Amino acid sequence: MDNSAKDVSVRKALAWKALNSMDSIWTSSMKTELKKKFFISTVESILLYGCEAWSLTAAEEKSLNGTYTRMLRKATNVHWSSHTTNETLYGKLPALSNKIAARRLRLAGHCFRHPELSAQKLVLWEPTHGHRGRGRPKTNYVDTLRRDTGAGDSAELATLMADRKVWRNHVASRLRAP
């Protein structure tokens, strides 16, 4: 898979558009917890649509986390100059990059364990021939999965995905709040 920068920028723009269109909700006297639930069900779902297939660089993850924090601050009426920490702002919510990683891992596990499709070959496919151009290698899906799980190589990743209980624990560990 190729870099997902264009899709990420489109998702961010659509999420900002949705957030700004609901200004009357964010500025209302509604409870903060209710605003967060509404934010997650509307804006976050728009932002994370299709994120299971993204292979993000560290800079893109940082940009997404910052955008998400700014959006959450706007939704909860917490100004950036107020002395409210991100831990207080997020509360029990996990970081956005952890949510993306958990969704990515969940999809990869489903695809790998599907018996009828050759999706497991697609999930772990790496080119073995050809000439790579100059410069830094592009971030690919397998490397992203390895980074998310801490697996050393594709064989170790495959054994982790094959055991459903172990894989479920990897996914659940990503969703725990910091």
Regions found by a protein language model. Give the residues of each.
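Short linear motifs embedded in intrinsically disordered, charge-biased segments
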Residues: 1-178
